[in-house]
Amino acid sequence: DLQAAYQGDPAATSASEILLCYPGMTAVIYYRVAHALYELGARLPARLISDIAHSTTGIDIHPAATIGGYFFIDHGTGVVIGETAVIGERVRLYQAVTLGAKRFQEGEKGILVKGAPRHPIVEDDVVIYAGATILGRITIGKGSIIGGNVWLTHSVPAGSNVLQAQMRNTTVEPKHLIDAVYQPRI
């Protein structure tokens, strides 16, 4: 994670600077500790640690989320990563990115099902730019780029570029939405 931050930010001058001054790095360190505790069954301490990280950095990562290595959050403020999100290796997020739920699964008598998969899967080598909102149990394919301020509720295949301008003034039937909003990279 530290190496990803250093190599991913041209303004970074040293590992010490990143460890001491980058809220994204602070949030990821807290997440790694909280996630380990969560996996060991110490869920309340894990949630407390993630709450401290959120209060300190403005970045909200649920300790149950699964995040691969070499992960970098640049600028960070307002990033939200939900409980069942899965993030691959070498993923980079910018400020105000949300990996959230679109709807909640209900069981008997309308009671919400705890822990049901409802957050995105982000595959390896993906970059998600500032203000993007990605909702639901969808997949962002390997090597994709999600542009700033994109609102995305459908999966996109590997190598896609999804840009906010493609979303503007677009009226399509839901089954044709993916064709209207993504453009595979060549």
What are these regions (language model features)?
Residues 54-170, 174:
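Structural signal for interior beta-strand "rungs" in well-ordered beta-sheet cores
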